Amino acid sequence: MPAKRQIAEARGRQAERRAALWLRLKGCSVLAARVKLPGGEIDLIARKGRLIAFVEVKARARRDDALGAVSVQSWHRIARAAEVWMGHRPKFAGYGWRYDLIALAPGSLPYHLKDAWRPGLA
């Protein structure tokens, strides 16, 4: 793997660890991280009560850049992976679920945008 790609991977893993810690501090259980499934990848899967959140994590120099860094195509891939993940976990059949985004930028707290995207609306 090229050095530039290794640095990006390391930064991504660090951002995901920070986001997972933030979710735990907010009372969520982190069920899984870096989940690769047919059709897509999910950065974090978290649970709070009877709600499952499929969380995309983005770290950029500015928070606004992180908030705009997920394309509609990426959300569709995340949604496909989420459907596969939920389909293999019947114990969560009665739970609600949503797609969240955690934006990270130097010098600021993580910004958790709940329900950042909904299938069929974009």
Curated annotation (Swiss-Prot):
Entry-linked SUPFAM superfamilies: Restriction endonuclease-like
Single GO molecular function: nucleic acid binding
Any single Pfam family the record assigns to this protein: UPF0102
PANTHER family in the record: UPF0102 PROTEIN YRAN
Gene source species: Hyphomonas neptunium (strain ATCC 15444)
Protein name in the entry: UPF0102 protein HNE_0764
Source taxonomy: Bacteria, Pseudomonadati, Pseudomonadota, Alphaproteobacteria, Hyphomonadales
InterPro entries: Restrct_endonuc-II-like, tRNA_endonuc-like_dom_sf, UPF0102_YraN-like
NCBIfam families, A to Z: PRK12497.1-5 (NF009151)
Annotated family: Belongs to the UPF0102 family.
Superkingdom field: Bacteria
